[in-house]
Amino acid sequence: MTETVLNQGYGYGIVIGLGFAFAIVMILVTYVLKRYVGEVQDSEHFTTASRSVKTGLISSAVVSSWTWPGTLLTSAGMAYEYGVCGSMWYSFAFTVQITFFTVIALQVKRVAPGAHTIVEIVKARFGQASHAVFLFYALGTNIIVSAMLLLGGSQAISAITGMHVVAAGFLLPLGVWLYTVSGGLKSTFLSDWTHTVIVYIVILITLFVAYTSSVHIGSIDKMYDLLTEVSKTNPSTGYKGSYLTVTNRDAVFVGWNIVIGGFATVFCDPSYGQKAIAAKPISAMKGYFAGGLAWLIVPWAMGSAAALSCLALTNNPVSVTYPDPVSSKQVSEGMPLLYGMTALMGKNGAAAGVLILFMASTSATSAELVAFSSVMTYDVYRNYFRPNASGKELVRVTHVFVTIFAVCMGALAVLFNYIGITISWIITFIGIALGPAVFGITLTLFWKKMNKYGMIIGCPMGSITGVVCWVGSCYKFSNGVVNKTTLNTPYANAVGNFTGLFSGLIYIVLISYFFPNKSDDLNNLNEKFVLGDDATAEEIVDAETEKKQLDRSLRIGIFVSWIIFFILVIIVPLPMYGSKYIFSKLFFRGWIIVIIIWTLIAALYITFYPLYESRDTIVYLCKLAIGKAKAPEPMNYVDAVEVEIESLSDDDKEKKANDFL
């Protein structure tokens, strides 16, 4: 067994010390925004950030939400196992779901701008029974993804520092809980930005050390030579055993499994819906597309730096596992990420690796906490128990659910660890068992002829079909052996993912045609959503969307999403796969240079654009600090009504005033 690179002090220091430090900073920021900028922590602000988040923060939130520990660990494992195409396939495949979800985000802003959760929309259209079905899928995804975030982070931190995995599992969400309870979704956006900036800094350091300053590698050409040499002693499954080719059948299967199976982890996870709801209408499309393209480079660059370094230095005494290669179990756990950073930078590299895993775990966990509490508050508590609950009561309830979930997700992560469930296994399971709800929510938002039975019957039938085909194909491809290991083989996963996702679509369409009902007017959905009675003027006014802008943005979003899909999963990888091309040294130089430039652009955008968009607030706070400005008083509900009335034409003032009052 490989000894831990760092001692337990690093693990506890980062998890507890840094966790509480971030919590204190976020709580302080929340106080400043409340005290000096006039942000009120009402029920609408806690769950939707007053639907006022701008493009830059939406982009950083997308990057943060999709940068799981599994993102960094699994992409590194794929890069170590398959070479240059491993992290490429991972990043390309998972980017597709983000760009397609842009379309969902835009449609939510068009037809249901007053919604608090994406699950609420199903109830507004189809009623209680359909709502209960999709609630099961949304909470199932939310709970499993949350546990997976902590599982990946706690296992990796334990492996590199020796910190007990149970302690890591329960302590990781503690600091997150503190600032999430204090600041709600807005604090999540702010922590997303902070965490993401740090992740980009670590990635850039790793890239430049690997390809410019490392005494063991130090140049692109040296990396090429080392990868060529290691393929002779430890060949890959790719063409001629090379790690410098995209021609690898196993990698293609894994990539397409991610493309299909990954949709459920985005479309069914209410945390992504929360970000769509929180965005300003005109910010949704730009924020999601820019965030998706900025995220794409995170696993690609990290795999190309840390994991390829780990692979290239296999026969060098500096390797953590020298003289042996990294074991298949360690590869499946994503350890090439940490081992590669350790080989490049020693204990400093290992500490940096633990740091970004901590950032990935806690930032995404915060979003999941808010999503769970929002769904439980609005879709369960207010829907089934207290329809007339006040805004203050809803805030108290969200705090309770955030607290409960913070404890439960840690317990589930520990359970997964002890029964031997891996991150890749969980991702596969979500795609197969919960994937049918992808078309359930998509058609709910877009197809007027879909009826409630499509959701009630079609989605569960799709899940059953996917699981049955998954187990059956596992039995066939694994010579009759069905267990948690054989269920995670690429061919069985492919069958389960495809049948689970697309059988759900078929069932929903057939059921909707066999049991037709009156086509719904999707434009009337927003009338069924009720804002909290403590909503401020801005929240009330912003609930009325700019429909013409959104119509145009939706058309652009659909077109761009399909273009990105074809480029990333067909036009770029498949011709390279079919050509059986092994990278030349010149081509590899260009490949790495593109990665470095892309990373720099993404890092600069995510770091500075949110600051640029918030420049007025920053200047205002600076003036407050030197006594040249006065903090406004937050508006109450009566003030909100007056502001709204004044914004209307004279003919509509009396009617609207009566509606509000």
UniProtKB/Swiss-Prot annotation:
<dbReference type="GO" id="GO:0015204">
    <property type="term" value="F:urea transmembrane transporter activity"/>
</dbReference>
<feature type="transmembrane region" description="Helical">
    <location>
        <begin position="56"/>
        <end position="76"/>
    </location>
</feature>
<keyword id="KW-0812">Transmembrane</keyword>
<feature type="transmembrane region" description="Helical">
    <location>
        <begin position="165"/>
        <end position="185"/>
    </location>
</feature>
<comment type="function">
    <text>Involved in active transport of urea.</text>
</comment>
<dbReference type="GO" id="GO:0015840">
    <property type="term" value="P:urea transport"/>
</dbReference>
<dbReference type="InterPro" id="IPR001734">
    <property type="entry name" value="Na/solute_symporter"/>
</dbReference>
<dbReference type="GO" id="GO:0015606">
    <property type="term" value="F:spermidine transmembrane transporter activity"/>
</dbReference>
<feature type="transmembrane region" description="Helical">
    <location>
        <begin position="591"/>
        <end position="611"/>
    </location>
</feature>
<keyword id="KW-1133">Transmembrane helix</keyword>
<dbReference type="InterPro" id="IPR031155">
    <property type="entry name" value="DUR"/>
</dbReference>
<feature type="transmembrane region" description="Helical">
    <location>
        <begin position="251"/>
        <end position="271"/>
    </location>
</feature>
<dbReference type="GO" id="GO:0005794">
    <property type="term" value="C:Golgi apparatus"/>
</dbReference>
<dbReference type="GO" id="GO:0015848">
    <property type="term" value="P:spermidine transport"/>
</dbReference>
<protein>
    <recommendedName>
        <fullName>Probable urea active transporter 3</fullName>
    </recommendedName>
</protein>
<feature type="transmembrane region" description="Helical">
    <location>
        <begin position="132"/>
        <end position="152"/>
    </location>
</feature>
<dbReference type="InterPro" id="IPR038377">
    <property type="entry name" value="Na/Glc_symporter_sf"/>
</dbReference>
<keyword id="KW-0472">Membrane</keyword>
<dbReference type="Pfam" id="PF00474">
    <property type="entry name" value="SSF"/>
</dbReference>
<feature type="transmembrane region" description="Helical">
    <location>
        <begin position="86"/>
        <end position="106"/>
    </location>
</feature>
<dbReference type="GO" id="GO:0015489">
    <property type="term" value="F:putrescine transmembrane transporter activity"/>
</dbReference>
<feature type="transmembrane region" description="Helical">
    <location>
        <begin position="556"/>
        <end position="576"/>
    </location>
</feature>
<keyword id="KW-0333">Golgi apparatus</keyword>
<dbReference type="GO" id="GO:0000139">
    <property type="term" value="C:Golgi membrane"/>
</dbReference>
<comment type="similarity">
    <text>Belongs to the sodium:solute symporter (SSF) (TC 2.A.21) family.</text>
</comment>
<dbReference type="GO" id="GO:0015847">
    <property type="term" value="P:putrescine transport"/>
</dbReference>
<feature type="transmembrane region" description="Helical">
    <location>
        <begin position="419"/>
        <end position="439"/>
    </location>
</feature>
<feature type="transmembrane region" description="Helical">
    <location>
        <begin position="13"/>
        <end position="33"/>
    </location>
</feature>
<feature type="transmembrane region" description="Helical">
    <location>
        <begin position="352"/>
        <end position="372"/>
    </location>
</feature>
<feature type="transmembrane region" description="Helical">
    <location>
        <begin position="454"/>
        <end position="474"/>
    </location>
</feature>
<feature type="transmembrane region" description="Helical">
    <location>
        <begin position="397"/>
        <end position="417"/>
    </location>
</feature>
<feature type="transmembrane region" description="Helical">
    <location>
        <begin position="288"/>
        <end position="308"/>
    </location>
</feature>
<feature type="transmembrane region" description="Helical">
    <location>
        <begin position="495"/>
        <end position="515"/>
    </location>
</feature>
<feature type="transmembrane region" description="Helical">
    <location>
        <begin position="197"/>
        <end position="217"/>
    </location>
</feature>
<dbReference type="GO" id="GO:0005886">
    <property type="term" value="C:plasma membrane"/>
</dbReference>
<keyword id="KW-0813">Transport</keyword>
<dbReference type="GO" id="GO:0005737">
    <property type="term" value="C:cytoplasm"/>
</dbReference>
